Amino acid sequence: MVVALRYVWPLLLCSPCLLIQIPEEYEGHHVMEPPVITEQSPRRLVVFPTDDISLKCEASGKPEVQFRWTRDGVHFKPKEELGVTVYQSPHSGSFTITGNNSNFAQRFQGIYRCFASNKLGTAMSHEIRLMAEGAPKWPKETVKPVEVEEGESVVLPCNPPPSAEPLRIYWMNSKILHIKQDERVTMGQNGNLYFANVLTSDNHSDYICHAHFPGTRTIIQKEPIDLRVKATNSMIDRKPRLLFPTNSSSHLVALQGQPLVLECIAEGFPTPTIKWLRPSGPMPADRVTYQNHNKTLQLLKVGEEDDGEYRCLAENSLGSARHAYYVTVEAAPYWLHKPQSHLYGPGETARLDCQVQGRPQPEVTWRINGIPVEELAKDQKYRIQRGALILSNVQPSDTMVTQCEARNRHGLLLANAYIYVVQLPAKILTADNQTYMAVQGSTAYLLCKAFGAPVPSVQWLDEDGTTVLQDERFFPYANGTLGIRDLQANDTGRYFCLAANDQNNVTIMANLKVKDATQITQGPRSTIEKKGSRVTFTCQASFDPSLQPSITWRGDGRDLQELGDSDKYFIEDGRLVIHSLDYSDQGNYSCVASTELDVVESRAQLLVVGSPGPVPRLVLSDLHLLTQSQVRVSWSPAEDHNAPIEKYDIEFEDKEMAPEKWYSLGKVPGNQTSTTLKLSPYVHYTFRVTAINKYGPGEPSPVSETVVTPEAAPEKNPVDVKGEGNETTNMVITWKPLRWMDWNAPQVQYRVQWRPQGTRGPWQEQIVSDPFLVVSNTSTFVPYEIKVQAVNSQGKGPEPQVTIGYSGEDYPQAIPELEGIEILNSSAVLVKWRPVDLAQVKGHLRGYNVTYWREGSQRKHSKRHIHKDHVVVPANTTSVILSGLRPYSSYHLEVQAFNGRGSGPASEFTFSTPEGVPGHPEALHLECQSNTSLLLRWQPPLSHNGVLTGYVLSYHPLDEGGKGQLSFNLRDPELRTHNLTDLSPHLRYRFQLQATTKEGPGEAIVREGGTMALSGISDFGNISATAGENYSVVSWVPKEGQCNFRFHILFKALGEEKGGASLSPQYVSYNQSSYTQWDLQPDTDYEIHLFKERMFRHQMAVKTNGTGRVRLPPAGFATEGWFIGFVSAIILLLLVLLILCFIKRSKGGKYSVKDKEDTQVDSEARPMKDETFGEYRSLESDNEEKAFGSSQPSLNGDIKPLGSDDSLADYGGSVDVQFNEDGSFIGQYSGKKEKEAAGGNDSSGATSPINPAVALE
């Protein structure tokens, strides 16, 4: 058995004795038990007629207990009494008296006591007082009418019959309606009804006192009292007088722990009010209540500190009356130390302590087996000393039951306690060989519950038989438990408990295992987070590997768990994530790491911050100040949500003029909760207040009541007054209208005045509602003095300021006179002109419009492409720099003055920009010629910016960091290719090409590459095959710059039916990009083999479509050899003629390149799209936008069936094309791609849709 010591706590006893009873585990010994009273009736019983009376007395004990009763100290035998029934139960002496009339119940009145005895002693019950009460009756009496004059006091008596049980008194009328009670009319604790002063409305003849007796469940009533009030015309005021109590002071005794009720009822006119005072100290506010309109003071649970004087003070306008209560706090007897029953072994000393307290001090008496000690023989060996009964050297014959009884005038206490002397062998009640587990640093408790008589001594030994108490960490308890504090790993082992008395000794073994303590290695950290965000707490802990670990989370002491219907909490792997933080989430969060042996906790605090809460309350005060357009606003502070409130924003809304729009009246510091506001006349103000902290504004407060300020004349005039004409013969006067909150009345209008400037004549005026006025029939551009004044039903606004306005403008007639144009550089000029005559402007000179456009290049036949640019120059400036111009271009320039009406006539001028450096060449490509040579192809720049004089080509190996750079000046501007030789096949190069004018080289285009990447192992790229019913197309993507080569394609049918038949291998050129094989069989699988230089390079599979073999038509003459030879001869002849034609064309018909360029479309109007392959980049920018805008038609055309055609017609050109047997080039290759280059090397071909000329502009 393993015992975890997590919840084992020791039982501490103050003396070496056992528990009150023999433990149930102590088996095999038949031990007797002294009698013990287990149940008895209350100390006081009140019975009523026809009630049954039950007197209970039950007790336990071995041997069986015998019962006897006494009544008023005389032996009482219930079995012999008529009408008494005794319970037939082994442990009960209870009996019941069956009542049928009041006399029968009264015959059994008295003080009863029960005695329970066996051979070990006698136990005694407390005194049971039985009281009989008859049916309540109101004594016969004659009630005379009560006559009193209006304003006097009166007391209506009740005087109910006496009762042993508390009564409830009610005053009602004959209609069973309660008499209304207030400060003037009050019922006292004694049941009387007190009138401080009577009114004529109190005149009734049916004041009835009802008494409710809860014991008998009956209500009886007094004869009605007739109260007759005599009316009077002059009620006399009088000072208060106490009706109860009637004297000036009283002395009361209050019982400790019971409630205290004090009462003062006064009369007088006007009706007095009651106050309560305590001169000796403050009232205990937490225990005092005031009832019955302050006439009754009730003090709950009276204590000794409540002793002293209490005063009631009755006051009205004529004086006061008072009464002093002097309260003495006393107490019924109560236990300080109650005697306890114990078992003792022979020779021990027995001591029973009976310590009581009370006020007055209780008298203590002792009994032994129910007999007072004074009546016992004097040779008894007990002694009574300081409230204790002591017996020395007890023996089994000294077994007894004692009674300690304490009484004073407020009550009685009784306690039974036995001294049981017995001899029992020692026995350890704790199981043997238990295993206990605890963690290092904690305290372990090894149990050894022993029992015997005399009480066995308990000793703990280690495995060596040595007492463990030599180590100060080991400590014993009186109940035999061994405690070991500050456990260490080497405390693991076996321990032995030895219990012994004078009869025997016994031993058990306990096993202790000490485990590693749980430790939190990384606990959660306190943090401050914003509302609505999420927070993550982490927790890591180390555990003993043999224990079951657990990490849980707690928030403010409550366990946290993930909720199935909410994602508020996420708990996993020592992490607690709280989503959507709210202010209710702030608090202390704990990581609890636990095993079955220990628990450790690490705590962190979470503060949730955010904008403030709403202002809870808003109050307007000083409303009389509204006549002065002021009001005071007060509010309760808002919740700051852990961030100090920086300010309060006071806003208002006018539901009449601008509903649902709020305006700020100002802000006050955050520590201020009221302010006086300056208001505007005639505004319907509804206020609200918003708190603001560093996280922003909170929710606004509830809105206030609406207040309206009185009307007044306007305090402001419109602003931004202007006079401008929208026609040449008028002037439009405009202004910014007043805000509605500045109207100071329900409506506002504007008084507009005007007159020509410089005249002293009368003002013309007009009152309008709109924020403008049109003055007609004016001269062109004449200045006027203008005033605009606000007016309403209460008067005019302040005297307005005079504003100068002008009538309508006309178009300017002034022409700017150019002073000259200064060429700053090839792309910028400075334009200057003289100021215009303002009289000719016909209005306000707003500035100058400078318009310019490029008419074309200075080169011949350059096409005009007009794109106008505009620059607006301020009126006080007469020059402008035009930048961003195209070099070597002709420009047209216009300058116009303009006013508010428009622009005047223009002055014109033309100028030209000088030459500049050209742009970068277009489309630089590298083509492999051999392992050591490359062919560079390019296009001229789109922007010549002058006359091209040639190109500068430079290159260097990349691996040498720019060393060994070579440069070539290519003087021919028409050059488009250049062949580089003697290159290393193992290096990559950086090539840079620049076009030049007389101003020098321009931007460069850069390309990197080498022969190594272009002339290596043949690469078919992305090769694929598709099939139809009787054909298949093989396609591939030629690698850019790859040297051309020829290879074989072989189709081989698969399957037994096909017999593995192969078609003749076909010779194909790499630059073809595709090959179509015809004459295939439908629904057939084929293998495709690619060979180069008799070496296998690639293989793929394809399957044709269809469902059967294709039937070939009968062979005709087209398949005969003679026909094939004839056709071949014709084709060869045509090819020779075509070659001769190209040679002749290349040698003759040449013309100026410049003339040719000038015949082409302007490069800006129709730029050419580069159709060559490869990439390039500028030295200035790798991502410069290209100027190509149009596309060329495809040069490939439809795919031509190749079959076994080896014709070179597709590779014709101005140079010879020869192949080795393997299909590789012998000479320079200039295939279809060469045809696409416009104006190639030594080419003079005409412009055509597939050979467009390159635009040089």
Curated annotation (Swiss-Prot):
Recorded consequence of changing Y1070C: In HYCX; partial loss of axon guidance and loss of proper synapse formation, when assayed in a heterologous system
Membrane topology: Single-pass type I membrane protein
Primary location class: membrane
Positions of the Fibronectin type-III domain: 615-712, 717-810, 814-916, 920-1015, 1016-1115
Outcome (variant: R525H): Found in a patient with L1 syndrome; uncertain significance
Reported effect, I219T: In HYCX; decrease in cell-matrix adhesion; decreased cell migration; no effect on the localization at the cell surface; no effect on cell proliferation, when transfected in pheochromocytoma PC12 cells; no effect on neurite outgrowth, when assayed in NGF-treated pheochromocytoma PC12 cells
Ranges of compositional bias, category Basic and acidic residues: 713-725, 1176-1187
Leader peptide range in chain numbering: 1-19
UniProt keyword annotation of Phosphoprotein present: yes
Subcellular location: Cell membrane; Cell projection, Growth cone; Cell projection, Axon; Cell projection, Dendrite
Membrane topology, Extracellular segments: 20-1120
One MF term in the entry's GO annotations: protein domain specific binding
Keyword Ribonucleoprotein: no
Disulphide bridges: C57-C114, C158-C209, C264-C312, C354-C404, C448-C497, C539-C591
Outcome of swapping M172I: Found in a patient with L1 syndrome; likely pathogenic; loss of homophilic interactions at the cell surface; no effect on the localization at the cell surface
UniProt-reported outcome of changing G452R: In HYCX; severe
Subunit details: Interacts with SHTN1; the interaction occurs in axonal growth cones. Interacts with isoform 2 of BSG.
Family: Belongs to the immunoglobulin superfamily. L1/neurofascin/NgCAM family.
Disorder association: Hydrocephalus, congenital, X-linked: An X-linked recessive form of congenital hydrocephalus, a disease characterized by in utero onset of enlarged ventricles due to accumulation of ventricular cerebrospinal fluid. HYCX is the most common inherited form and occurs in approximately 1/30000 male births. The primary diagnostic criteria of intellectual disability and enlarged cerebral ventricles are often accompanied by spastic paraparesis and adducted thumbs and, occasionally, visual defects or seizures. MASA syndrome: An X-linked recessive syndrome with a highly variable clinical spectrum. Main clinical features include spasticity and hyperreflexia of lower limbs, shuffling gait, intellectual disability, aphasia and adducted thumbs. The features of spasticity have been referred to as complicated spastic paraplegia type 1 (SPG1). Some patients manifest corpus callosum hypoplasia and hydrocephalus. Inter- and intrafamilial variability is very wide, such that patients with hydrocephalus, MASA, SPG1, and agenesis of corpus callosum can be present within the same family.
Protein's job: Neural cell adhesion molecule involved in the dynamics of cell adhesion and in the generation of transmembrane signals at tyrosine kinase receptors. During brain development, critical in multiple processes, including neuronal migration, axonal growth and fasciculation, and synaptogenesis. In the mature brain, plays a role in the dynamics of neuronal structure and function, including synaptic plasticity.
Protein name, UniProt field: Neural cell adhesion molecule L1
